[in-house]
């Protein structure tokens, strides 16, 4: 007679993984820790740390006769910086979280104060795209451009007049700070002449097309070479003997 013991049969199958469902409290905590607007800063900082550590290890390995001096400097830095780092190593993330929340508040405030016509822009763009598909590209695009400029030009001109000098000054300051980094000046000396030449050729082509009556060239903007030369500190003026003329205004119907 078979043994009728209550022992369950032994299975050789591995135990199934137990999936833990996240509770609303856990999801709320994770959302609180996640950076909504500045997460890319956190990721970029982590990537920079990894690359810097790898580069430092490689340089230290190839230091050769300078290795004892490198070790001495490294030990001194660790002795001085270590206690400070242990005390404040959590500050950057907290600071990022604080700034992230401030960005969120600014976005919400901007959304509240932005004119309704700006909020309607995506819908207007979809409507314009549908109209272009139905009625054809050239005539519709011309009409839409004239209508849009007639409505937006006064506001755009006012905003441009107020903010363009500030943006130009900030760009110049950022460019000056960037050029204090190693290798940047040598790279820009190699790149900017080519950019100046291409800008001059582009401006000349657009101006010639506008003189010949090209409808497309009428709507193409010119590269502001004089303004860029002030920002970059490099003569980006057009290579042509005479500067490119200003764009012709769109004729009104």
Swiss-Prot record:
Highest taxon listed in the record's lineage = Eukaryota
Q: Which parts of the sequence are annotated with region: Disordered?
A: 1-26
The UniProt regions of compositional bias labelled Basic and acidic residues, in chain numbering, are: 13-26
User: According to its UniProt record, which protein family does this protein belong to?
Assistant: Belongs to the REF/SRPP family.
Q: Read off the PANTHER family from this record.
A: REF/SRPP-LIKE PROTEIN OS05G0151300/LOC_OS05G05940, REF_SRPP-LIKE PROTEIN OS05G0151300_LOC_OS05G05940
Protein known as: REF/SRPP-like protein Os05g0151300/LOC_Os05g05940
Organism phylogeny: Eukaryota, Viridiplantae, Streptophyta, Embryophyta, Tracheophyta
């Amino acid at each position: 007679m078979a043994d009728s013991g209550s022992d369950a049969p032994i299975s050789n199958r591995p135990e199934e993984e137990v999936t833990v469902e996240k509770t609303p409290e856990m999801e709320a905590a994770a959302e609180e820790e996640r950076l909504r607007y500045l997460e890319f800063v956190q990721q970029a900082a982590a990537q920079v740390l990894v690359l810097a550590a790898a580069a430092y290890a490689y340089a230290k390995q190839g230091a050769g006769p300078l290795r004892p001096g490198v070790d001495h400097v490294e030990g001194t830095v660790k002795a001085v910086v270590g206690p400070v780092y242990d005390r404040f190593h959590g500050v950057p993330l907290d600071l990022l979280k604080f700034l992230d929340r401030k960005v969120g508040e600014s976005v919400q405030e901007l959304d509240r104060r932005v004119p309704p016509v700006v909020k309607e822009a995506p819908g207007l763009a979809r409507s314009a795209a549908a109209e272009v598909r139905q009625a054809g590209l050239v005539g519709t695009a011309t009409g839409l451009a004239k209508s849009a400029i007639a409505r937006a030009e006064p506001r755009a001109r006012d905003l441009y007049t107020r903010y363009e000098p500030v943006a130009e000054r900030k760009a110049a300051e950022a460019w000056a700070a960037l050029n204090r980094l190693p290798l940047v000046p040598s790279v820009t000396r190699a790149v900017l002449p080519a950019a100046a030449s291409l800008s001059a050729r582009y401006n000349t082509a657009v101006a010639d097309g506008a003189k010949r009556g090209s409808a497309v060239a009428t709507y193409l903007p010119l590269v502001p070479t004089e303004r860029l030369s002030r920002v970059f500190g490099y003569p980006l003026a057009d290579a042509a003997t005479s500067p490119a003329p200003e764009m012709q205004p769109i004729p009104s119907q």
